[in-house]
């Protein structure tokens, strides 16, 4: 299913989140199970299914990484259940350095500045990846789709690192 069509949006990495939320509320009002309280069991079941579908679509389009994956799915490249590893050794080396930095924060004299520095570094790198990703997602070339998949994998790694940094920060300041 094309989630962009469901919300009457053009397929794009950049989505107007306010418009997305507005369309979500409209769709929810139209199919909410409460509207079908006096309907047949089949209509009630369909309403619940449609509501779940709308919720899934909204969560997917709201999240930039999932949105990028959905765009690739629409082009015939499925990433959601893959176990492919990254091939970019430079990125993997950088990731190892970041993980070492995460470990060192626990023993740092100035964890605040190291945490801020890592947040900035992660954000800057994710912005760079996103900049490279956007034109690949609109391309019709399969090679570009494969490269987009690699960029999405990197964004997933960055999101995990960001989560780890947040956990380290929470543990230090709790």
Swiss-Prot record:
InterPro entries: DnaJ_domain, HscB, HscB_C_sf, HscB_oligo_C, J_dom_sf
Gene3D superfamilies, per the entry: DnaJ domain, HscB, C-terminal domain
Molecular function terms from GO: ATPase activator activity; protein-folding chaperone binding
Keywords: Chaperone
One GO CC term on file: iron-sulfur cluster transfer complex
All residue ranges annotated as the J domain in the record: 2-74
Example GO biological process: [2Fe-2S] cluster assembly
Cystine crosslinks: none
Entry function: Co-chaperone involved in the maturation of iron-sulfur cluster-containing proteins. Seems to help targeting proteins to be folded toward HscA.
Subunit architecture: Interacts with HscA and stimulates its ATPase activity.
Family (UniProt): Belongs to the HscB family.
Protein name, per record: Co-chaperone protein HscB homolog
Species this protein is from: Shewanella halifaxensis (strain HAW-EB4)
Upper taxonomic lineage: Bacteria, Pseudomonadati, Pseudomonadota, Gammaproteobacteria, Alteromonadales
Protein's gene: hscB
